[in-house]
C-alpha cells in the first residue's frame, strides 16, 4: 500500500486537478489513515474502522478525476463503480455484492504481479535453460565425458551470446503453454458456490496442451519468463494474500450515488434506487461476501461516494446510509480563472495535448496568453447560459476551435499557427453569442 504522507498525496493530485483543496485533503487523510491503522497492534487494529467519505459537487469539477488519480496512488485494490449500474437483489441487473467480487479479482491480479516480480530472476534462469535446450538439445547418451564437456563448453558460449543479445533474431521451435479460455457463468443469488465449481470444472477441461511454435528468441524469452514465473507462484498463498489485501486496504469509489436517491412518491418497488441503497448498507457497515476466491469481510474496506446532487440532496439518501458516510466534502464550482489554469497547469494539459498531436503532422501550434483567456471565458460563458457541465465544456470548445487546423494539418506540414484572442474570436464568437447554437454545438 501507499506510504505517502497527506501532503505528498495532495501535491501529486495538484499536478492533475485544479483547486478542490478540501476534497484532496479529505481523500489524502483517508488514504494515510489506512497506513496508520496497519501500524497498530493487531487487536486494537480491528476496532479502527475507516471513515467513509461523501463528495458533493456539480458535474465536471473533478470528483471522478480524483478517483482515477487516487487509484494510481493507492497501490492497493481500488475499484470505481457507477451506482446506477446496480439493482436490488432478485431483479434483473447487477447486484451490489459484485463490487466486492470485482475488487477481489483486482487484488488477485495485483498480488500475482507482485509475486511474479519477486520470482522473476528464477523465472529468467529457467527460461534461459529452456531456450538453451532448444538451441542445443542434450545428448541422449551421457556416458561419454569428452562429448559432455564439449557440450557444456558450447552451452556456456551460447549462454554468453544469449545474454548479450546476439541471438535475439534467431528463430527456434519451442513448446509454449496455450492460454486458457475463460468461461463466465451468470448465477442467481445464493448459488455462487455451485457456479464456482462449474467454472473450475470447465477451466480444467479447457486446459490445452503446450503447442510447439516457431518464433524469434527475443519473443520466446518473454513468453517463457511469464510461463515460468506463473509456475513458481503458489496459488493458495496468492488467494490468501489477495483476500487479506482487499479486507485491510481495499477502496471502493461509488460514483453517481445521487442518482439512486428516491425522488418524490413512487407507488411501485424502487429496485434501482432505494433498493440499491438498502443492499449497499451491509457492504458499507461490514458483512461477509462469498467470492470464487474465498470469503471476504468488508468491515475495513474504505468507501468513497460522490454525486452532483443537482436533482436530489444528500438528505434524500436513506438515513442509515447517510450515517455510514460521516465525512462530507463539498467541491466548488469552477470559475473562468479555474478554466484558464486547467488549460495550462496540469500535467499533459489540453493545450499540451493539441500541441503534441499536431506536432506529429509537422505543424507547430502556439497558444498565446490572450488566446487561453478567451477560450476559458468562452467555456465559462456557455456553461452559464446553458447547462453547467464544468471542465468537460473545455473539451467541446477546444475541439470546435481546433477543428479546421486538425482537418488540414496533414496538408500543411511545416506550418505554424498562433492561437490568440483574435483567432478564438473568429472561430467561437458566433457560437458563444447565439444561445441556440451554443446549446446544440458547444
UniProtKB/Swiss-Prot annotation:
Keywords: ATP-binding, Chaperone, Cytoplasm, Nucleotide-binding, Stress response. Pfam families: AAA, AAA_2. Residues 136-156 are annotated as: Disordered. Its main location: cytoplasm. ATP binds at residues 18, 60-65, 255, 320, 392. It is found in: Cytoplasm. The keyword ATP-binding applies. One of its GO terms (biological process) is protein unfolding. Gene3D superfamilies: 1.10.8.60, DNA helicase RuvA subunit, C-terminal domain, P-loop containing nucleotide triphosphate hydrolases. One of its GO terms (cellular component) is HslUV protease complex. GO terms for molecular function: ATP binding; ATP hydrolysis activity; peptidase activity; proteasome-activating activity. ATPase subunit of a proteasome-like degradation complex; this subunit has chaperone activity. The binding of ATP and its subsequent hydrolysis by HslU are essential for unfolding of protein substrates subsequently hydrolyzed by HslV. HslU recognizes the N-terminal part of its protein substrates and unfolds these before they are guided to HslV for hydrolysis. A double ring-shaped homohexamer of HslV is capped on each side by a ring-shaped HslU homohexamer. The assembly of the HslU/HslV complex is dependent on binding of ATP. Belongs to the ClpX chaperone family. HslU subfamily. This is ATP-dependent protease ATPase subunit HslU. The gene is hslU.
Amino acid at each position: 500500500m501507499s506510504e505517502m504522507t497527506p501532503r505528498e498525496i495532495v501535491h501529486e493530485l495538484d499536478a492533475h486537478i485544479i483547486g478542490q483543496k478540501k476534497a484532496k485533503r479529505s481523500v489524502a487523510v483517508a488514504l494515510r489513515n489506512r497506513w496508520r491503522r496497519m501500524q497498530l497492534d493487531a487487536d486494537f487494529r480491528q476496532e479502527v474502522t475507516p471513515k467513509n467519505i461523501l463528495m458533493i459537487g456539480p458535474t465536471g469539477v473533478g470528483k471522478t478525476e480524483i478517483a482515477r488519480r487516487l487509484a494510481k496512488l493507492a497501490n492497493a485494490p481500488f475499484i470505481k463503480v457507477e451506482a446506477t449500474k446496480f439493482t436490488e437483489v432478485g431483479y434483473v441487473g447487477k447486484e451490489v455484492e459484485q463490487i466486492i467480487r470485482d475488487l477481489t479479482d483486482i487484488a488477485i491480479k495485483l498480488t500475482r504481479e507482485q509475486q511474479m516480480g519477486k520470482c522473476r530472476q528464477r523465472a529468467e534462469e529457467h527460461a534461459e535453460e529452456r531456450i538453451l535446450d532448444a538451441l542445443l538439445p542434450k545428448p541422449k547418451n551421457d556416458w561419454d565425458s569428452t562429448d559432455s564437456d564439449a557440450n557444456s563448453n558450447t552451452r556456456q558460449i551460447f549462454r554468453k551470446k544469449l545474454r548479450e543479445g546476439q541471438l535475439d533474431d534467431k528463430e527456434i521451435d519451442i513448446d509454449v503453454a496455450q492460454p486458457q479460455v475463460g468461461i463466465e457463468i451468470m448465477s442467481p443469488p445464493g448459488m455462487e458456490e455451485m457456479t464456482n465449481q462449474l467454472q473450475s470444472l470447465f477451466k480444467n477441461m479447457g486446459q490445452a496442451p503446450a503447442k510447439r511454435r516457431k518464433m524469434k528468441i527475443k519473443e520466446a524469452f518473454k513468453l517463457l519468463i511469464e510461463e515460468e514465473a506463473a509456475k513458481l507462484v503458489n496459488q493458495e498463498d496468492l488467494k490468501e494474500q489477495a483476500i487479506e489485501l482487499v479486507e485491510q486496504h481495499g477502496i471502493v469509489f461509488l460514483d453517481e450515488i445521487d442518482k439512486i436517491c428516491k425522488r418524490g412518491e413512487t407507488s411501485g418497488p424502487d429496485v434501482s434506487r432505494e433498493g440499491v441503497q438498502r443492499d449497499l448498507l451491509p457492504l458499507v457497515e461490514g458483512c461477509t461476501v462469498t467470492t470464487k476466491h474465498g470469503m471476504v469481510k468488508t468491515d475495513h474496506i474504505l468507501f468513497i461516494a460522490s454525486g452532483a446532487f443537482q436533482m436530489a440532496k444528500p438528505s434524500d439518501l436513506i438515513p442509515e446510509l447517510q450515517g455510514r458516510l460521516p465525512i462530507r466534502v463539498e467541491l466548488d464550482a469552477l470559475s473562468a480563472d479555474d478554466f484558464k489554469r486547467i488549460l495550462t497547469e496540469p500535467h499533459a494539459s489540453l493545450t499540451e495535448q493539441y500541441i503534441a498531436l499536431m506536432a506529429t503532422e509537422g505543424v507547430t501550434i502556439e497558444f498565446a496568453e490572450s488566446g487561453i483567456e478567451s477560450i476559458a471565458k468562452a467555456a465559462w460563458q456557455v456553461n452559464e447560459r446553458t447547462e453547467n457541465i464544468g471542465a468537460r465544456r473545455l473539451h467541446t470548445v477546444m475541439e470546435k476551435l481546433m477543428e479546421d487546423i486538425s482537418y488540414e494539418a496533414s496538408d500543411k506540414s511545416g506550418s505554424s499557427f498562433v492561437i490568440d484572442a483574435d483567432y478564438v474570436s473568429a472561430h467561437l464568437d458566433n457560437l458563444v453569442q447565439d444561445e441556440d447554437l451554443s446549446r446544440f454545438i458547444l
